C-alpha cells in the first residue's frame, strides 16, 4: 500500500473504488399492517410478488392498459424520428407522415371539396362561401339525420368477463371487515356535568338550551343537544 503523498492522491482520485456489494445491506421490507398479511408474507419474494400472490394491489391509482407500453414506445420512436436524431431515417419519416395523412383523410368528411373535421356530440361546423356568407351548418352525430350502420346497432351491454377468483387472504379480510365493531362514543365526566346543568336549568326545553349563551357557548344545534341528552339519560338508567 502506498503511503504519504501517493496515498493522498489516490484518495482524491475520481476513479470509483471497487467495493464489495453485500445483499445484507439492502433495505428489507417490514410488514407492519394487518396480522393476516404478516402471517402470509413470504420474505423470499418482492413486495409486488407478495401482493400479487395475496390478491392485493400495490397501487390503488395505477393504470394497467393493454397495449400502453406499445403506444409509449411508438410515441418515443415517432419523437425520435421527428427530431431527426438519425439522418438515415428519412424514408421512415416520410412513411409515417404519409400514414398520418391517410388517417386524417379517413377521419374527415368532404363537403363541397372542403375537409370537414369529425364532429362529436354538441359540435357544429359552419360552411361559408368565397364571400364569407354561411352556406350550410353541419352538426355532430346527435343532430345528423343520417347515421352509420355502427350507430344503428343497439347496445347490448358489456360482455360478461370472468371475474378473478378471490384469494383466501381477501376472503379473510372481507369477513373481518364485516365483523368490525363500532366504537360507541363515551361521554366524559365534563360533558355529563354540562348536560346535567342544562337539564337542571331548562328541563326539557331544547330551544331554551339552544339559546342559552352562558351554557351553550359552542352553539350546539338542537339535534346535537337532543342526542347528547338522550345518551346521558340512557347512561343514568344503566347506573341506577
From Swiss-Prot:
Transmembrane segments: none annotated. It holds the Pfam family Nop16. Its main location: nucleus. Residues 1-11 have a biased composition (Basic residues). Keywords: Nucleus, Ribonucleoprotein, Ribosome biogenesis, rRNA processing. One of its GO terms (cellular component) is ribonucleoprotein complex. GO terms for biological process: ribosomal large subunit biogenesis; rRNA processing. Coiled coil: none annotated. Residues 147-166 have a biased composition (Acidic residues). InterPro entries: Ribosome_biogenesis_Nop16. Residues 1-26, 143-166 are annotated as: Disordered. It is found in: Nucleus, Nucleolus. Component of the pre-66S ribosomal particle. Involved in the biogenesis of the 60S ribosomal subunit. Belongs to the NOP16 family. This is Nucleolar protein 16.
Amino acid at each position: 500500500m502506498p503511503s504519504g503523498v501517493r496515498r493522498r492522491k489516490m484518495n482524491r482520485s475520481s476513479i470509483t473504488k471497487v467495493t464489495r456489494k453485500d445483499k445484507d445491506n439492502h433495505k428489507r421490507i417490514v410488514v407492519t399492517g394487518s396480522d393476516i398479511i404478516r402471517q402470509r408474507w413470504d420474505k423470499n419474494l418482492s413486495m409486488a410478488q407478495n401482493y400479487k400472490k395475496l390478491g392485493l394491489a400495490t397501487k390503488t391509482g395505477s393504470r394497467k392498459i393493454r397495449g400502453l407500453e406499445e403506444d409509449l414506445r411508438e410515441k418515443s420512436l415517432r419523437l425520435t424520428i421527428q427530431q431527426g436524431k438519425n439522418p438515415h431515417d428519412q424514408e421512415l419519416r416520410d412513411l409515417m407522415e404519409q400514414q398520418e395523412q391517410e388517417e386524417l383523410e379517413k377521419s374527415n368528411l368532404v363537403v363541397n371539396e372542403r375537409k370537414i373535421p369529425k364532429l362529436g356530440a354538441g359540435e357544429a361546423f359552419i360552411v361559408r362561401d368565397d364571400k364569407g356568407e354561411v352556406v350550410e351548418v353541419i352538426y355532430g352525430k346527435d343532430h345528423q339525420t343520417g347515421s352509420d350502420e355502427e350507430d344503428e346497432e343497439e347496445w347490448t351491454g358489456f360482455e360478461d368477463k370472468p371475474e378473478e377468483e378471490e384469494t383466501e387472504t381477501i376472503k379473510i379480510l372481507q369477513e373481518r371487515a364485516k365483523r368490525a365493531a363500532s366504537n360507541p362514543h363515551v361521554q366524559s365526566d365534563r360533558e355529563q356535568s354540562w348536560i346535567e346543568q342544562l337539564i337542571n336549568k331548562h328541563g326539557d326545553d331544547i330551544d331554551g338550551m339552544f339559546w342559552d349563551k352562558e351554557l351553550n357557548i359552542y352553539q350546539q344545534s338542537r339535534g346535537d343537544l337532543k342526542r347528547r341528552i338522550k345518551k346521558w339519560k340512557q347512561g343514568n338508567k344503566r347506573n341506577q
